[in-house]
Amino acid sequence: MNLNKSNKFVVIDVETTGNRPQDGDRIIEIGLAVVWNGEVTKTASSFVSCDQEIPPFVSRLTGITKDDLIDAPSFSELAPRILDDLDGACLVAHHIDFDLQFLNNELERAGYESFQGNVLDTVEMARMLYPTLDGYRLASLAEQFNLVHDQPHRAGSDAEVTAHLLLLMKKKLYALPFVTLQQLEACTTDTFSGMQLCIYEAMKTVRTSHHKNDSSYAIYRDFALKKPQANNRTQAKVSIPFHAEHFFGKDGALSSISPSFEHRNGQVDMAENVHACFEDGKHLIVEAATGTGKTLAYLYPAVYKSRENEAPVVIATETVALQQQIKDRDVPLLEKGLGLPIEAAVLKGRSHYLCLQKFAHFLEQIRGARQASYDEQLSVAQLLIWLTETETGDVEELNLPNGGYALWEELKSDPESCTHSNCTFFSRCYYPRARDNARQADLIITNHALLLTDHFQETSTLPSYEHLVVDEAHHLEEAAGRHLGASMSYQHFMRLYNQFGVQENAGLFANISVVIDRHPTAVSADWPNERKQELQSLHYEWNQLFNALQTAIVKKDKRTRQKSEGYLPEDVVDTNVFDAWKRVEAGGKDVIRAWRSITRTLKKEALTPAEETLLQKVNTLCNDLEEAQSILASLLTSVENEVYWAESDANKRPDRLRLYRRPINISEQLSGKFFSNTKSIILTSATLTVKGSFQYTIDQLGLTDTQPKCLQLSSPFQYEKQAQLLVPEDFPEIRQDGEERFTEAVAQFLRSLTSSVNGRILVLCTSHQMVKAVSRMMKPHMQRLNYSLFAQGVNGDNRSKLVKQFRNQERSILMGTTTFWEGIDLPGEDVRALIIVRLPFAPPDDPVYMAKAKQIEASGGSAFSRLALPRAVLRFKQGFGRLIRTKRDRGLIFVLDKRIIQARYGKVFLRSLPTLPSVFAPSKELLARADEFFHDGKRP
């Protein structure tokens, strides 16, 4: 590696006619920035003449037109100066593969050799050094670090910003502890050479400096860990008074410390009711519409009760986003209002937390015989940096590459590895620390999954508590169903099988063989081969079982195009399935017995810490395999009040088969083991009523006999002034006119609407098929409309990434299905128009819905009125709530489903919404109304 000029970096950025130089695409602009001795010493940019047409989308993205290239120099004219700058330097680019292939293509066309020096990718470097960022686009990084980036997608500006980003990242790299740099050097052999160069130079500098270890780090067993914040738990917690009006009132404590404070009567009412139910030991259901400030309304009485009882109050949410919002935004605001510190601890399931002992063992492996993949190396580097920054060790903080999440399965905490007696890292480990923090906290913020696990499996993960708030409570019934149900797939078995490492020189076999060689008298030399044969036999039987299952299920249900296929275990478990399952069951027991036997035998030997960790991993894998076999058995055994179904891919491949089971009705379980075991539970959400009634929620959650108190709080927004609901009367209907005509009408309506809205449009669909079909029809028109389109499943499935891209473009359309109907906050100009394509009824072939409906019909009830309609109304209200998020928002809601006006049940949807102007008219009239709404002088 050439280190003579290791302090010189040349950043290159190119704008091109396309993405494929091998197909003739050419550079049309090149930007360059020289970084030398820690400073940007030179910047330059130039248009580049070429004989290719500039595609319209490139011109729209960059602003470069063919006129700009008329007098531009050729690349061959620019090449000598570029090569002079590159002499002895490390070449840097943001997405180096792209820029380097174009640069080398042009160099070779001009008669020069391609660049052969060190290269550095700032995307790779940023991913490594900033492992918790949401994204690594240059514009996002510039915004994150306050770098001036006036002309995105112009080569000169992009190169200069990348140069300043490089300097920031080098500064961070050189500030890392020496032990972290040592670990990085050992695990980045597949990164770009420039990255290795930077790490090597940082190591040299830090090794010779007098401040090798910053006081903010704790160096423990070759890891640099962030020191946890000192706690002052020796001080007695101060009790607080409770007076909702004094706290939330117009001249209350909150008004004096919050610049965005708005007095809301509903907030006061909710706080008082939560307080009263906590005091009286009663349950409360609160529907708090958007804008009522429900989070603070329950946090204030929750802290009061916690201090009064000297015991934590638990707050449970469905989504990670709300957990973080409560911890990072709402609790600090409450602290300011109360004028005292509040201890709020986030506690999740064990698998969310990193096991340091496993991580240390993995590092030892990749420094030895194990060959780590590129994704594993990048993930390890991210984890090493993250350890210097995280106090929680929670994977939710990380933005790992795709392969990194498979690695996490190896590194996450589990009961075998995480015990005080056998873990050298126990005093530093994150999961025990999280549990300890929870025991001392005023508020424990957790998720529905852990809450339900604690109740139904009696794991005692959560400390003892009497008072609970369930936010996002409209998800509780579904979450409980998932928890009380089960699923298993062929792929899950394969992941377990691969962890044994039967086919590779890695995994358990490679490691256990080394241990056996070190203790030859303890275990027979033939042991590994015998175990491999057992596992290969078990693998064969798994294949046979899933082939038999797929055949039996498809034979039973000829609708092979259906995504889900219901089955009854007694119908599917024919002779072939039964015999295959018994062979799998027996083979699995043999494997588990043999591997547990060797751990017992080897534990009698004098083992190294690494060997101890390996045996813990063996036990964990045996437990996982045993659990998987038990779950599969439950999916092949009929139980009353359960529904069973299977899913596979379009080709019905057995290796893509997944089996599910769910309880049809969980009201009895919730009533008996959940609500009866907690003194006071507050259930809250923005969507819990249908037509102003809580009865559907009460029935679903098993609260019929409990008689909870109910409170419905209307929104403080003036919907009659801020929004309108518009329904086109001339729109086709899917049932009568066909899906193709309906889809074409949706696309045409959207195209027509863009000129009136002139801003962001959110489109909510009820199926992925609809999203893809409308997106396909819209795509050819987006350039003419000067709009960007982001569609779930077309532009990716990452919701937060799609929302961020949507918000970054002023004229954009975001299309999504289920997960986009709730949980995304798009205030103000972020959404000007909301399109609800169809009323969100559950698919009629949904297995759980079908089973529930059948049960209701069997008892003489109407499945439509008691199940389908309430579900759809609650989902509709969630979607409706995406538009108006603050008192200053204005926007239009278009419902392209005439049933909301024409069907008898349509009024149930309308009566569940706040009062606002509703118009049922031809499309042209609604588009004219939209034009008037957005251009009446009240908005730009």
Language-model region placement:
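Walker A/P-loop
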Residues: 279-301
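Conserved pre-motif I regulatory segment
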Residues: 238-285
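A substrate-engagement module of RecA-like helicase motors
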Residues: 224-230, 241-252, 310-312, 316-442, ...
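A contiguous, basic/glycine-rich beta-loop/short-helix subdomain that forms a polymer-engagement track
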Residues: 409-442, 452, 457-459, 588-731, ...
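Conserved RecA-like P-loop NTPase helicase motor core
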Residues: 717, 728-741, 793-900
